[in-house]
Each structure stands twice: as C-alpha cells, then as structure tokens.
C-alpha cells in the first residue's frame, strides 16, 4: 500500500540508512483496525530487513491487541525519533527527526518454530539486552509476533536527510548565528 511521498527531498530510500534509523528507535507504534477508530499501541521491537522488513514484538497471551489481530492481521507500523535544537541549530534547522513507516501483516510465531528463538534474540539485541539461556522457558509463556512488510511498502523520512550511516545519529547543535553555510537548504526549498 505504498503512497508516493509529497516531500521527496526528505525521503530516505537506502536500506542501510533505514536500518541505521531503526537502530536508533526504541518504540514502534502498531496501528490495528478497530471500530470506530484504529487501535494504536506502542511496543518495543526487533527487526530484520532482508527481502522484506520484518518487525518482531512480544505480548501477553491475551488482550485487546490479540483480539483485534485475530479479526484483521493487516496493520501499519511507525517508528520515529525527534530532537529539538534549543538555542541552536544544525544546517539551519531548529529540529530534526527520523521516521520509518510501513504496512504489513501480523502473524503469531509458533513457540516451537526456529524463528521464535531468532525473533527473541533480535528483540533482545535491539533493546540492548543480553540473551540468557535460562530465559527460554519464561519466553514460552508470552507470545512473539512478526509483522512482515514488503520492501516496497516501507517509507522513511528525515528533516535533515542523512547521506551516510554515520550521519544517521542526530548531529550536535551549534549556537545560532555562527555563520553555517546553509545554501543547500535554500536550493532544496527552491
């Protein structure tokens, strides 16, 4: 369900940059179909971006999220980060953001499947936690889910578009009026 981005100058299409952006994001929001309005829930996540972008999340054995996913597994996801440069700027900008959005299909992972352990490890790694073999029995009491998003259904955007993976972390602000060369911004704005 890809829609063209209006502000294409801010679009990030390089897969390595998208992964680096996701690496800096801690929370993902899942939009699930409900009436009269979508049900949006924040979750921590892990991911793998091979042919498709696959997000992994965990949850309890019951709840609203699971009831709604049983009715309609088609979801949207958003992960984002934002910084405000108080008293300064970067390349003439007073703030910066990174966002990744996608549509996909959610599916529960069988606890006996090989993918369950992989998903568990990716989830832990993304959240800066260490895999402990003694946690495996505990993991059998929660659910792990995957959201599979086709690569063409993934969009990413930034206020100051990074050109390299090293530029993905937010740059430190410089005091206003320090004479930065901002001519590239004026050219982009046309």
Predicted regions and their residues:
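Short Pro/Gly-enriched beta-strand edge/turn motifs at strand-loop
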Residues: 12-14, 24-29, 127-130
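Short, structured beta-strand-loop surface elements
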Residues: 62-119
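A generic structural signal for nonpolar/aromatic side chains embedded in well-ordered alpha-helices
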Residues: 22, 68-69, 123
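Catalytic micro-motifs at enzyme active sites that drive phosphoryl/nucleotidyl and oxygen chemistry
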Residues: 32, 87-91, 132-135
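Extreme N-terminal tail/first-helix region
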Residues: 1-23, 170-179
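Short beta-strand segments
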Residues: 25-61, 77, 88
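C-terminal edge-of-domain segments
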Residues: 107, 111-190
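Short hydrophobic-aromatic micro-motifs
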Residues: 55-58, 77, 100-102, 146-147, ...
